Amino acid sequence: MEPKQRVVKPLKERVLPVVKNTQFVWFSGQVIVLISSVLYALQAIPFRSAPPFLFKSAAFGAIVAYAIVLYKTYSPNLTSRASWNKHFFARLMLDDNVQYFILALSMLIDRPILFSLAPYAIYATFHISTYLRSVLLPAIYPNISDAKTASYASRVSNLLNQYTRSQFQPAMQLVASLETFLLFRLFFGVFLRKNSISRLVGYIFFLRMRYTNSHFTRASIKAVSLRMDRLVADNRVPPVIKNAWHTFKTYVSKFGASPVGTAQSRPTASSSTTAPSST
């Protein structure tokens, strides 16, 4: 008796359910983040000017992607007011996805700053890679007897998996360094009138949460702080800058030492490569 051959659905029937899923909207948001960030950087870095809509587009893509993750995570709590307690709000405050969602909202409103897009773009490369490997490739190239197709899909999947595994930790270190750099960019931007002090304060709150959740951020802040101490110690630095730096450092140190709760029940972090669950 001949083995029964597996019936493979047409490509449209395989892909259409994927496109209709909210995961695909999340994926589309990540693609918008990556493409818009790259296009903005390609113009802003060499020419020091780029269309603001590219920056806003990247921020919008991030808002869409993180909004879906937050809805998937917290929608059961939203339907029951009994769950709106201090533990729920502490969980919200410590959730990386909430922090990046709020930061993206502020980026949509505020003046563009080039490097503020970089962490979102780096995260997007891993999110896109994981989604392609776990969702899109299996839909486009199902496990059929066509050796060439299976081999091609397998090679692409292996490359994506290898990229995720080998580059994840270095990428998180880079993200932490960029986010720490942005803190000092905003600090000096207040003196140069390139950004408001309210934006700096808001970002300090964001980085305070990152300091709690990420050992990469803690290591980065410590390293950059030591470098800044050496730079400010130079006799050529005006006393007003030295005093401002020491005051700022003291304030941030006290703020960073204040308790913000525990991260025991925190949901999946934004830096995770896991896509939101399907519906």
Swiss-Prot record:
UniProt keyword annotation of Transport present: no
Biased composition (Low complexity): 262-279
Disulfide bond positions: none
Domain of life: Eukaryota
Subcellular location as annotated: Golgi apparatus membrane; Endoplasmic reticulum membrane; Nucleus membrane
Membrane association type: Multi-pass membrane protein
Record-level GO cellular component terms: cell division site; cortical endoplasmic reticulum; endoplasmic reticulum; endoplasmic reticulum membrane; endoplasmic reticulum tubular network; Golgi apparatus; Golgi membrane; nuclear envelope
Subunit structure: Interacts with RTN1 and YOP1.
Record family assignment: Belongs to the PER33/POM33 family.
Function (record text): Required for the correct positioning of the cellular division plane by delimiting the actomyosin ring assembly at the cell equator.
Protein's name according to its UniProt entry: Tetra-spanning protein 1
Organism: Schizosaccharomyces pombe (strain 972 / ATCC 24843) (Fission yeast)
Source lineage: Eukaryota, Fungi, Dikarya, Ascomycota, Taphrinomycotina
